[in-house]
Curated annotation (Swiss-Prot):
There are at least 13 actin genes in potato. Its EC number is 3.6.4.-. This is Actin-46. Actins are highly conserved proteins that are involved in various types of cell motility and are ubiquitously expressed in all eukaryotic cells. Essential component of cell cytoskeleton; plays an important role in cytoplasmic streaming, cell shape determination, cell division, organelle movement and extension growth. CDD domains: ASKHA_NBD_actin. GO terms for cellular component: actin cytoskeleton; cytosol. It comes from Solanum tuberosum. One of its GO terms (molecular function) is ATP binding. It catalyses: ATP + H2O = ADP + phosphate + H(+). InterPro entries: Actin (IPR004000), Actin/actin-like_CS (IPR020902), Actin_CS (IPR004001), ATPase_NBD (IPR043129). Keywords: ATP-binding, Cytoplasm, Cytoskeleton, Hydrolase, Nucleotide-binding. It is found in: Cytoplasm, Cytoskeleton. Belongs to the actin family.
Amino acid sequence: AGFAGDDAPRAVFPSIVGRPRHAGVMVGMGQKDAYVGDEAQSKRGILTLKYPIEHGIVNNWDDMEKIWHHTFYNELRVAPEERPVLLTEAPLNPKANREKMTQIMFETFNAPAMYVAIQAVLSLYASGRTTGIVLDSGDGVSHTVPIYEGYALPHAILRLDLAGADLTEYMVKILTERGYSFTTTAEKEIVRDMKEKLAYLALDFEQELETTTTGSAVEKNYELPDGQVITIGAERFRCPEVLYQPSLIGMEAAGIHETTYNSIMKCDVDIRKDLYGNIVLSGGSTMFPGIADRMSKEIQALAPSSMKIKVVAPPERKYSVWIGGSILASLSTFQQ
């Protein structure tokens, strides 16, 4: 969350609401009935955590309201009734959801005006384009969204329920095979950090595996919060490989490359060339080093041989949805 015209968000926190498991034991401690974001994360030992956004879609409006309240009053410290609000939604978000979102903004927060934009479209704006296909992959869901002249093409949008959370789960699994156990939510956070700091995508998975068995060039050390140091090797590229081979976690789905290709093939034949030449990556789960080269290679194998393919991975892609929103909301045409 942040303000239009800024080049980075003012507040970044997980969409989590935590409620105390037990009624207040310590009287007068001023225990809140709910904690949001980082505070919920840090007090998770005494809380029951809930995630109101599942696979990119809001499914718990009371908790979502808590998150918005926290955003306005604690993070941004603005009165929502004084400023127009731009919210984002997942592609293919049900109409009822958008209506509910609008209702809460106007009735609960008294916003003077609001607009709901599709996340992937904002990412494309942030990259300075109005035509292209965006692969947006976050924690709960991935989407491929073809956009032509600023408009998303709903019939060609594809959703893949495979994203960051699944990669973290898989990392936990393959580390368990090595004898390291991570079970609690706190420990899973450690694995997520390990994934974000050390994982990368191999250009050629099989070849990378062979190289790893002979040498130790891939091995890296990671220090756990208690000071213990663990060494991870092939796990570094085995983990994000799931994006290209969902079968590794037993999912019968097309990988992100194939989903992108399928999405392009659902579009009019005349615009495919523009889409192949503008494949834009967005979201935290596209932050792995090597992802753009690998994507390029995989799409080239699927596309017609003469096709010019360009995969764009902007350095700020973790927040490009937000940045696109900041750009859009500061346009004078938008404010009217």
